[in-house]
Regions:
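Conserved ABC ATPase signature
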Residues: 112-116, 120
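Hydrophobic anchor residue at the start of the ABC signature
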Residues: 126
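H-loop/switch region of ABC-family ATPase nucleotide-binding domains
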Residues: 172-174
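Q-loop/switch helix immediately C-terminal to the Walker
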Residues: 72, 79-98
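ABC ATPase NBD coupling module
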Residues: 60-74
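Helix-to-loop junction immediately C-terminal to a conserved catalytic motif
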Residues: 45
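Catalytic Walker B motif of ABC-type/P-loop ATPase nucleotide-binding domains
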Residues: 137-141
Length: 201
């Protein structure tokens, strides 16, 4: 699998962002509300106009059609859109093991999305994205609506999968404890720059 490289990314207040994420590495991002964390992920996934570029392996973002890039570098936003009624219709392929690991029952695939809680939708959004087999993953606080037990359950399922698929991951993390559990490296947004912080103290 290929690594993800950010070259001179500029979006919103952020300027000249350079970052390399190795295959299988989780790089956590943090910073105050409005600092640009989500906008940076949207720029990398080609969902928002920006300066600079991103690369996945040797392929530059602007060298392929936007929809093809977004199929490889996939973002799970804090709030996802749902186009179909049933859970199963949102999955590119059946993922019963993933649904079970995240606390869903055998009948979940036939459920209407409208009956799911915000936390269940957040978990389902992650399963939906992984069912499309992306080559890089951008996660915008994917556990923000989950309690501690469910958060740990999601992490225990997701981390081995990231290592197995060797996915480079940018993860906007929810709190310092989570960063210490997950991050290979941690960058805090300060002003217009990324400042590397120690992961474990």
């Amino acid at each position: 699998m290929a690594g993800l490289t950010l070259e001179r990314i500029a979006v919103g207040a952020l300027k000249d962002i350079h970052l390399d994420v190795a295959p299988g590495e989780i790089v956590c991002l943090s910073g105050p509300s409005g600092s640009g964390k989500s906008r940076l992920l949207r720029a990398v996934s080609d969902l928002e106009p920006h300066g600079g570029t991103a690369r996945l392996g040797g392929v530059e973002q602007g060298a392929v059609a936007g929809h093809r890039w977004r199929r490889s570098v996939m973002m799970v936003p804090a709030e996802s859109a749902w186009w179909f009624d049933s859970v199963g219709e949102h999955l590119h392929k059946p993922m019963p093991e993933a649904l079970e690991a995240l606390g869903f029952s055998d009948e979940t695939a036939s459920w209407s999305v409208s009956r799911l809680s915000s936390g269940e939708k957040q978990r389902l959004a992650l399963v939906r994205t992984l069912s499309r087999e992306p080559r890089a993953l951008l996660l915008d606080e994917p556990t923000a609506n989950l309690d501690e037990t469910t958060t740990r359950r999601l992490e225990d399922w997701l981390l081995p999968l990231i290592r197995k698929r060797r996915l480079p991951v940018l993860w906007v993390a929810h709190g310092g404890e989570q960063i210490r559990r997950l991050a290979g490296r941690h960058f805090r947004i300060e002003g217009a720059r990324l400042v590397e912080e120690p992961v474990r103290t």
